[in-house]
From Swiss-Prot:
It holds the Pfam family Ribosomal_L11. This is Large ribosomal subunit protein uL11. It comes from Methanosphaerula palustris (strain ATCC BAA-1556 / DSM 19958 / E1-9c). Part of the ribosomal stalk of the 50S ribosomal subunit. Interacts with L10 and the large rRNA to form the base of the stalk. L10 forms an elongated spine to which L12 dimers bind in a sequential fashion forming a multimeric L10(L12)X complex. GO terms for cellular component: large ribosomal subunit. The gene is rpl11. NCBIfam families: PRK01143.1. Forms part of the ribosomal stalk which helps the ribosome interact with GTP-bound translation factors. InterPro entries: Ribosomal_uL11 (IPR000911), Ribosomal_uL11_C (IPR020783), Ribosomal_uL11_C_sf (IPR036769), Ribosomal_uL11_CS (IPR020785), Ribosomal_uL11_N (IPR020784), Ribosomal_uL11_N_sf (IPR036796).
Amino acid sequence: MAETVEVLVPGGRATAGPPIGPALGPLGINVKAVVDDINKKTAEFNGMQVPVKIEVDDKKNVTISVGIPPTTALVMKEVGIEKGSAEPNSIIVGDLPIEAAVRIARMKLDDMLSYELKTAVKEVIGTCVSVGVTVDGKKPKEILAAISAGQYDSVLEA
């Protein structure tokens, strides 16, 4: 019977310890080879938590699927911070250009609840609120209103 293991690992730095080792060890496969493969596939997401799905079939063949990091991790990497604000409504820790928000939305579009780029960008900007990041030097809620009013349509269509 095929087994599927879903884990969140640091990009490019997964280890044979928890959560991967204990999940794969009983399946009788080479955990080190799997970890090395995961590290190669997640190297571009260095410093971010990356969702990884490991499927092991009856013949012990391993298939590794790498997801896209959470929106929060992408926003923080783009801004260059390691942690979000402890008090996001009063302490601002960085600024995200609207173009970067659009880029993140395009990356995450398949995983989001949104069907359109405009609403996906709004989701990314909503994440900025909870992390304590401004967008184009303004409060995220001001940008959300401007997007709804159509002021950023040219950026969204580019």
